[in-house]
Structures are given as structure tokens and as C-alpha cells.
Amino acid sequence: MKKGLVLGRFQPFHLGHLNLIRTVLKDKNEPLICIGSAQCAHTKDNPFTVKERRDMIKLVMAELNCNYTIYEIPDINNYDKYVSHLEEFVPKFDTVYSGNTLVQRLFQTAGYEIVIPKMINREVWEGATIRQAMTEGDEWEGAVPPQIVDMIYHLNVIERLKNLA
């Protein structure tokens, strides 16, 4: 089976991520899910730890009934070396699935096939927008899978975000 790479920070895991993973599966590829900025946690832009992000992914993937693997990718802050850096952590993959133009450019330059998913509700299904809605008391629950809503409340992430702001 071919491997499809999905790279995200998952801060939090939202419906856009789920749509991306479903696209990988629809193409009959096995998802290799890479948690970017793995070393970052407890900041305004990265409130979740890598363990919490891994747990979110596992919660959602359990319902998709498929093979997948999660990898943790720390930042190196060097775009020229990023693809080779990621390749040190992840086995061979065939295709990169991403709606992020920087990710598309970096991996296309390195010779990878790129699949750009149909973007749905991009204005709402976006990590920064979701985190901002949480801190401002706006509706955000519709942008993440239900089990992630429960996890966010259980971890008291809204209070965490307010303390980080």
C-alpha cells in the first residue's frame, strides 16, 4: 500500500485535518501523520503537548478503522533542510497531502507528488481561528470532532489558553 504523508501541528486536531486524512484514505493510501513543532507546548500558538496531540489523533483515527502511523517532527527553522529533516523521522512515502502552500512548495521542490485537498470551511477549520474562538468565548465546538471537544474540556485547555494570552 502506498503511503500518504499528512503534516500538521494539530493545535487542536480539527475537521480540516479529518478531511485531509479522509482524502488520503479515499486515495487508498496509508496515512503517515506527522506532528510538526513537536517540541512546542504550552504557548499561545501551541497550547497542546505532543502527547495531547498524539492522543487527539488516536481518538479520531480509532473511528476510521484503518492502518496509520504517527510521527513527531521537531522544528529546525530551516526551510531548505526541512524535507530532509522530516525524512530522517519518517519511512519512505509516496505523496504529500497538504493545503499549506509552504508545505506544498517544499515537498514539490524535493520531488514529491502533492495532493491539494478540496478546502472546506477554511476560515473556520483552522487552528488559530479555533484557539481565538476558545479564548474569546465564541463557538468553536463545530470545528473539531466531538471526541476532541470532550478532550479539550477535560484538559481545561480554554483556561490554559486564557492564561497564555
Predicted regions: what they are:
Residues 1-165:
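Nucleotidyltransferase catalytic core that binds NTPs
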